[in-house]
Amino acid sequence: MAAAKTPVIVVPVIDRLPSETFPNVHEHINDQKFDDVKDNEVMPEKRNVVVVKDDPDHYKDYAFIQWTGGNIRNDDKYTHFFSGFCNTMCTEETKRNIARHLALWDSNFFTELENKKVEYVVIVENDNVIEDITFLRPVLKAMHDKKIDILQMREIITGNKVKTELVMDKNHAIFTYTGGYDVSLSAYIIRVTTELNIVDEIIKSGGLSSGFYFEIARIENEMKINRQILDNAAKYVEHDPRLVAEHRFENMKPNFWSRIGTAATKRYPGVMYAFTTPLISFFGLFDINVIGLIVILFIMFMLIFNVKSKLLWFLTGTFVTAFI
């Protein structure tokens, strides 16, 4: 018995080879490489083949692909994914990352997958690492059996959860819980028809506003989409915040603070990732991240209390030029 290969799609958010996201792929398939697919392209025919059921080599279940479309820096045709407000006030990084996913969902590639009756795709941003993919086969089967539309493989909120058994066998004990507003596009498995329906609804509604994750959750509720979140997701998908934090510092203007930040990222990756997270765009002129917001609040404090220290004003000025 045979079935169509499930696409495993790597979405680039940093400068990194897709094989680093799946470091063991070449050990299993000698001629395996990641085919690049961009706008207006479909899956290469040589990868669109069938696999034998229960093949002991799990890597042969999948067609490994790197998505290179949706680059808003090179093309303005993706502006319809965002409302006028978001096109002005959403940060460059937010629009860039979201556009890559929405352009993928709205691409000929996914229309072709629907025509060929491919049920699910696995999508992973390249700041993640999945060393062992053997959990995917039973997870995909369980998603089909339990009518799960989306399995999010990165947890945003920690705390007490009502967990449901997804897979229980001799190799895996996997649980999930129902998602709410804790939406992440970092790594997920999604039904092809669900993707097409979501992106169609986004476009018809005039594009996303600044509250992207709230809007996705709203659409899920309206369309009765079953999104589950993988419990203990870091066990299966390792997200490295250092990679994105370093990428952000590398794209800053070279200065003393950017070098300090790059060094601090190696020791405190989670903290620096949070501090460099962009929050809002100032009418498309520049983006303000967490550090920038702190600097703005500090400037307001100094103005209110009439601080006259030249050293403090000098240091604040260097922060402004570095982070705002």
Curated annotation (Swiss-Prot):
Reported modifications of this chain: Does not contain disulfide bonds.
Expression induction: Expressed in the late phase of the viral replicative cycle.
Transmembrane segment boundaries: 285-305
Transmembrane as UniProt keyword: yes
Recorded topology in the membrane: Single-pass membrane protein
Coarse class of the protein's main subcellular location: virion
Any one cellular-component term (Gene Ontology): viral envelope
Segments on the Intravirion face: 306-324
Pfam families: Pox_P35
Positions in coiled-coil regions: none
Protein name: Envelope protein OPG108
Gene (name only): OPG108
